[in-house]
């Protein structure tokens, strides 16, 4: 089969106008009517010209023909494809050449012809405008920089320009629809890409095989190694000479007299001696240093004192708690628990102050104390539990009064009854007075109640709020004198009084008025409880 471009005598990139002019010219030349002497040959040529123009004048037919031109020329799709390209596999052996000379079977001649044939095949598959200059292999005397190096640089990254259309399995012209045509084109493209990749790898492997055995490359590599070794030797020689030069400079170096440090300490001592002789022995400086040390110590002490003051400012003595910040201290001072503890502490301190200030107790101490405590007691809201605690000592007082009165026949004066009534009233207001009243009125037959001054609170929440206020030890040293109403004898304690009453029989029954007042007060308290 003849190429259509050759039949029309045009280039492969010819335009439509050029194709039309060439067709008309050849048609007039080979038309059978104008070649009567050679009608058969003219008819055959005219058919080829007409077929070529029919294909190339159609853009789609021309594009398909350009892609499959080599396959059609070498057998096409109708018959078996005859690949007449160079077989590169037989050049991967040393038996294909003999020696490294420039003769016909020498190394350089054989492989030079191989790469010239590969370049020719590439030129046939591309347009003239796209032709690149293929570097030649050269001979045994070729220069490395101008011939050998450019050759290997190009062919080691070789990419073929062939489209390998003869490898396609499907003829897209036979597709019934466009979807089937696209599927055929996709499969054909995969096959062409695979064949192109195999061709590129085959050529690159052949180049690597040749380069490994090329004497010119080996000679250049040896030359480069020698040059590198020479450069390293020169660099080492320069370093050695530099070291020798520095060693000579060190030997020639002489230290100046003003740079020596040997006599520096001696000179400093002499200077100090001169200054001491002229200005003194330096005691003032020592004193200054001592003063500075003292100032530093005083500063440390003052800092510690400030820290202690800061700690004292954030400490609550009533609740026995310390705080880290002023805000926490202020919040604590606003709490109900703190106010209650402050009131109890204030009351305790006032009582201690009164006990220390008065060496003797008046005839009616309960009346005076109760009046003063009623005036000085802080007015604050108390919880229900605290009110109940206050009412219990009053009931104990009434019970003791009833038991001791008729059972033992103790005589009670009207003054005592008045005292009991006043103390019962005071019990509702001050928890501290419960202690004093029960200590004076309770009989000694109940030693357990005598030991307990204030009932012990229970529970975690009321543990701090209801701490018992202990009676200070000093008032116990000042004994309260108790007198017998019959013989007016004074006793230091209630036990002594009751021993006297049992021994002498001076006990008298309480009057009816006092009993009535005691029972009435008890009934009122029971009513309050029932509420």
Swiss-Prot record:
Function text: May act as a co-chaperone for HSP70. May play a role in ribosomal RNA (rRNA) biogenesis, possibly in the maturation of the 60S subunit. Binds the precursor 45S rRNA.
Organism: Homo sapiens
C2H2-type zinc finger span: 314-338, 482-506
Phylogenetic classification of the source organism: Eukaryota, Metazoa, Chordata, Craniata, Vertebrata
InterPro entries from the UniProt entry: Chaperone_stress_response, DnaJ_domain, DnaJ_domain_CS, J_dom_sf, Matrin/U1-like-C_Znf_C2H2, Znf_C2H2_jaz, Znf_C2H2_sf, Znf_C2H2_type
GO biological-process terms attached to the record: protein folding
Illness the protein is tied to: Bone marrow failure syndrome 3: A form of bone marrow failure syndrome, a heterogeneous group of life-threatening disorders characterized by hematopoietic defects in association with a range of variable extra-hematopoietic manifestations. BMFS3 is characterized by pancytopenia with onset in early childhood. Some patients have additional variable non-specific features, including poor growth, microcephaly, and skin anomalies. BMFS3 inheritance is autosomal recessive.
GO MF, any single term: RNA binding
CDD domains: DnaJ (cd06257)
Comp. bias (Basic residues): 381-392, 455-464
Keywords: Chaperone, Cytoplasm, Metal-binding, Nucleus, Phosphoprotein, Repeat, Zinc, Zinc-finger
Protein name: DnaJ homolog subfamily C member 21
Biased composition (Acidic residues): 281-311, 364-375
Segments of this protein annotated with the region Disordered: 279-311, 327-474, 502-531
Basic and acidic residues: compositionally biased ranges: 442-453
SUPFAM superfamilies listed in its UniProt record: beta-beta-alpha zinc fingers, Chaperone J-domain
UniProt superkingdom: Eukaryota
């Amino acid at each position: 089969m003849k190429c259509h471009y050759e039949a029309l005598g045009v280039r492969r990139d010819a335009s439509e106008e050029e194709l039309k002019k060439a067709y008309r010219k050849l048609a007039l030349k080979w038309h059978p009517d104008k070649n009567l002497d050679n009608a058969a040959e003219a008819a055959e040529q005219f058919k080829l010209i007409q077929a070529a123009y029919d294909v190339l004048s159609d853009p789609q037919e021309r594009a398909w023909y350009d892609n499959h031109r080599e396959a059609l020329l070498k057998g096409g799709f109708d018959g078996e494809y005859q690949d007449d390209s160079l077989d590169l596999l037989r050049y991967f052996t040393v038996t294909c050449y003999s020696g490294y000379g420039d003769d016909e079977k020498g190394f350089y001649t054989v492989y030079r012809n191989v790469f010239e044939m590969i370049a020719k095949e590439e030129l046939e598959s591309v347009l003239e405008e796209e032709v690149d200059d293929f570097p030649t292999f050269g001979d045994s005397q070729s220069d490395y920089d101008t011939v050998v190096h450019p050759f290997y640089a190009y062919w080691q990254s070789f990419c073929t320009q062939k489209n390998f259309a003869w490898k396609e399995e499907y003829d897209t012209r036979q597709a019934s629809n466009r979807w089937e045509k696209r599927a055929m084109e996709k499969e054909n493209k995969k096959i062409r890409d695979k064949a192109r990749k195999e061709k590129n790898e085959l050529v690159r492997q052949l180049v690597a095989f040749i380069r490994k055995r090329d004497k010119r490359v080996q000679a250049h590599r040896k030359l480069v190694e020698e040059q590198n070794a020479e450069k390293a030797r020169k660099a080492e020689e320069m370093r050695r000479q530099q070291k020798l030069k520095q060693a000579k400079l060190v030997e020639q170096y002489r230290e100046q007299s003003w740079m020596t440090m040997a006599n520096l300490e001696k000179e400093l001592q002499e200077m100090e001696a001169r200054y001491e002789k002229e200005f003194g022995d330096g005691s003032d400086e020592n004193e200054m240093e001592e003063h500075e040390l003292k100032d530093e110590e005083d500063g440390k002490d003052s800092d510690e004192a400030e820290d202690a003051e800061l700690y004292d400012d954030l400490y609550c003595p009533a609740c026995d708690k310390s705080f880290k910040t002023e805000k926490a201290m202020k919040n604590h001072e606003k709490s109900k628990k703190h106010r209650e503890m402050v009131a109890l502490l204030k009351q305790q301190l006032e009582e201690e102050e009164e006990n220390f200030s008065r060496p003797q107790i008046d005839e009616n101490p309960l009346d005076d104390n109760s009046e003063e405590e009623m005036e000085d007691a802080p007015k604050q809201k108390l919880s229900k539990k605290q009110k109940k605690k206050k009412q219990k000592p009053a009931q104990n007082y009434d019970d003791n009064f009833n038991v001791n009165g008729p059972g033992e026949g103790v005589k009670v004066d009207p003054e005592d009854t008045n005292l009991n009534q006043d103390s019962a009233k005071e019990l509702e207001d001050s928890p501290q007075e419960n202690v004093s009243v029960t200590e004076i009125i309770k009989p000694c037959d109940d030693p357990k109640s005598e030991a307990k001054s204030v009932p012990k609170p229970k529970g975690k929440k009321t543990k701090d709020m209801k701490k018992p206020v202990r009676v200070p030890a000093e008032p116990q040293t000042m004994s309260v004198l108790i007198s017998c109403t019959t013989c007016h004898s004074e006793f230091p304690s209630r036990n002594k009084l009751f021993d006297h009453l049992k021994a002498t029989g001076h006990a008298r029954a309480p009057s009816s008025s006092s009993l009535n007042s005691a029972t009435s007060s008890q009934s009122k308290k029971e009513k309050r409880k029932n509420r």
